[in-house]
């Protein structure tokens, strides 16, 4: 993405916007100027002079992956190209880390990961520039050599202010400024990954259980992801009961299950396995805290209960 950057220098030959000369792409910015002449209470306007300023700096910003998930790390690459004969130094990169309005202020869904800055000029790694973690993230002391390029790479952590629902996005904006240039703005958008995020916990009751008594295992499956687990996902739960249980009673989300269609149990080894396609878990729902702006996750939950005689 290119923005207008105004710069003038000697011996500029006329070129068209976007024209390639000696392997370099040049872009034009046009300006106009008009003078006035006042005399004897009269005012005369001059003709309008039209000039063009040759752009020599361009920039682009990309994410290594265009999707994110909860607590993910995103790697950003900012590339600055100098198509002119003069080195630019003292440039500053300011990244808003995806800040967006909330209430009367803003919240920021990304946090800079300390120590991850990499700074290259013409492909050669340079000493790390000065970094202020922010938000916003500020990287200063950038130099772009004449006819060359600079690349800044850094990582950001997805935090509690990042929306996670389906079709959510983080729009990230960075501005390159300083060194006498007109600021250049670059943007990158990443999308919330569509996926389930499952955890499972197991509890037992009663504790202790009497010999030849009934023992119950409860499996709580939680989904903090924005996508439900459906039959075609073929989720399976496997367990080996020790001590081995007999006379099993199994239910899933309060509905009794039958051995064969829903599960398989080997009473000689204690191995229990659900049949693929029977375990389903709804997607999570999300709500934003009205005070802090942090996103609260309400997991989707399914429960498998297995009881048997010890």
Per-range role (PLM):
Residues 14, 23-310:
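Exported/extracytosolic protein signature
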Residues 1-27:
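N-terminal amphipathic/basic-hydrophobic helices that include classical n-h-c signal peptides
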């Amino acid at each position: 993405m290119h923005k207008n950057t105004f710069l003038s220098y000697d011996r500029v030959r006329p070129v068209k916007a976007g024209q390639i000369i000696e392997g370099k792409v040049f872009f034009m910015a046009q300006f106009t100027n008009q003078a006035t002449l006042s005399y004897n209470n009269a005012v005369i306007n001059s003709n309008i002079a039209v000039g063009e300023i040759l752009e020599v700096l361009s920039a682009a910003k990309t994410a290594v992956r265009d999707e994110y998930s909860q607590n993910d790390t995103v790697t950003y690459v900012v590339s600055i190209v100098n198509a002119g004969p003069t080195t630019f130094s003292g440039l500053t990169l300011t990244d808003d880390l995806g800040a967006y309005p909330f209430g009367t202020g803003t919240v920021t869904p990304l946090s800079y990961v300390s120590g991850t800055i990499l700074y290259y000029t013409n492909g050669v790694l340079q000493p790390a520039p000065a970094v202020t973690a922010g938000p916003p993230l500020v990287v200063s002391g950038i130099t772009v050599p004449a006819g060359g390029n600079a690349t800044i790479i850094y990582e950001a952590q997805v935090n509690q202010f990042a929306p996670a629902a389906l079709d959510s996005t983080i729009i990230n904006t960075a501005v390159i400024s300083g060194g006498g240039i007109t600021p250049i703005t670059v943007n990158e958008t990443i999308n919330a990954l569509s996926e389930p995020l499952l955890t499972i916990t197991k509890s037992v009751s009663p504790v202790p259980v009497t010999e030849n008594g009934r023992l119950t295992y409860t499996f709580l499956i939680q989904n903090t992801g924005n996508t439900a687990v459906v039959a075609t996902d073929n989720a399976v739960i496997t367990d080996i009961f020790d001590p081995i249980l007999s006379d099993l009673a199994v239910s899933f989300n309060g509905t009794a299950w039958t051995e064969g269609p829903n599960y398989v149990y080997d009473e000689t080894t204690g191995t229990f396995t659900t049949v693929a396609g029977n375990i389903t878990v709804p997607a999570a729902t999300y709500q934003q805290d009205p005070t802090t702006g942090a996103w609260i996750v309400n997991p989707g939950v399914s429960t498998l209960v297995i009881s048997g005689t010890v």
